[in-house]
């Protein structure tokens, strides 16, 4: 690699590449979430018959992973570059390897391995066949072919490619700590994110109000159900995301027992499943607008039989 791309140049390069492959460039969704998969641009769009090709950066918060900014590779918040293609292209792995070349990583000159790692997200009732992508011994990407999302079988199958941007940038820039990554010319990652890393870690582990969080979870759960009763999928899913983040804060604080933990996850999963079913039903009412006319006519005729 001759030129060491900055963090933002890595993002720009991936955006341009996947735009050229036919992906819409979405923006980060404005609710806390633990992974790019939980964005409605993946979770909702992976279900139902309509095609969907999108790419976006997603800041992902995992309160239990915070380390006060003292760990060089473990973060309260990291950034994922998410690519979702439905139906999955037959050459998705080749497309991915070509994206690495755009970043200056020649697959012929490096040890790139696809290590089987089937994926599951119990809190959203989602699972799929998956692989971790290892670059010279370091995981940089997760590949998943969704089989189930929100408890619904996916058809057509959606392919998801999730780049870990901090890990990728650490490799490209040859630094040992994420805080030494050059975000932009003359600006280090740590100069932007070290302070919030420390503060969010302190809040998550020491300061959060457990009673308030428990109360909020109950309120968010009820509001999600209330929105679903009116067929309001997106407001309901926003509250599912709020439930998930609130649970993650409670978990980081040690406020839930092992038994309670399973119960909270089941409550979030049940809501997510209703959201998924309602989303498909509402898209059907709209006539699945992203389908081509011929496919739409056939599908709606079959459903009407």
Curated annotation (Swiss-Prot):
Superkingdom: Bacteria
Reaction it catalyzes: tRNA(Gly) + glycine + ATP = glycyl-tRNA(Gly) + AMP + diphosphate
Swiss-Prot/TrEMBL keywords: Aminoacyl-tRNA synthetase, ATP-binding, Cytoplasm, Ligase, Nucleotide-binding, Protein biosynthesis
Enzyme class at the top of the EC tree: ligase
Transmembrane spans: none
GO molecular function: ATP binding; catalytic activity, acting on a protein; glycine-tRNA ligase activity; transferase activity
One GO biological process term: glycyl-tRNA aminoacylation
Recorded family membership: Belongs to the class-II aminoacyl-tRNA synthetase family.
Protein name, per record: Glycine--tRNA ligase alpha subunit
Lineage of the species this protein comes from: Bacteria, Bacillati, Bacillota, Bacilli, Lactobacillales
């Amino acid at each position: 690699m001759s030129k060491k791309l900055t963090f933002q140049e890595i993002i720009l390069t991936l955006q341009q590449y996947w735009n050229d492959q036919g992906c819409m460039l979405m923006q980060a969704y404005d609710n806390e979430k633990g992974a790019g998969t939980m964005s409605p641009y993946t979770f909702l769009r992976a279900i139902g018959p309509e095609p969907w090709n999108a790419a976006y950066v997603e800041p992902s918060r995992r309160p239990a992973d915070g380390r006060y900014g003292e760990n060089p590779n473990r973060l309260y918040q990291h950034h994922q570059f998410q690519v979702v293609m439905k139906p999955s292209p037959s050459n998705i792995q080749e497309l991915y390897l070509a994206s690495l070349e755009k970043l200056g990583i020649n697959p012929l000159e490096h040890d790139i391995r696809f290590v089987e790692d089937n994926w599951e997200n119990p809190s959203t009732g989602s699972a799929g066949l998956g692989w971790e992508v290892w670059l010279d011994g370091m995981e940089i990407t997760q590949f998943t072919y969704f089989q189930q999302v929100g408890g619904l079988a996916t058809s057509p199958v959606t392919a998801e490619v999730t780049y870990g941007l901090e890990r990728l940038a650490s490799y490209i820039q040859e630094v040992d700590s994420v805080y030494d990554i050059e975000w932009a010319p003359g600006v280090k990652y740590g100069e932007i994110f070290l302070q919030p890393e420390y503060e969010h870690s302190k809040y998550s582990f020491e300061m959060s109000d457990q009673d308030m969080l428990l109360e909020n979870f109950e309120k968010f759960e009820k509001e999600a159900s209330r929105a679903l009763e009116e067929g309001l999928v997106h407001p309901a899913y926003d509250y599912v995301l709020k439930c998930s983040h609130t649970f993650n804060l409670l978990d980081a604080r040690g406020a839930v027992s092992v038994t309670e933990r399973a119960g909270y996850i089941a409550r979030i999963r049940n809501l997510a499943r209703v959201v998924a079913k309602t989303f498909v039903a509402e898209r059907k009412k709209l006539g699945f607008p992203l389908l081509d006319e011929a496919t739409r006519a056939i599908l709606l005729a079959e459903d009407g039989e």
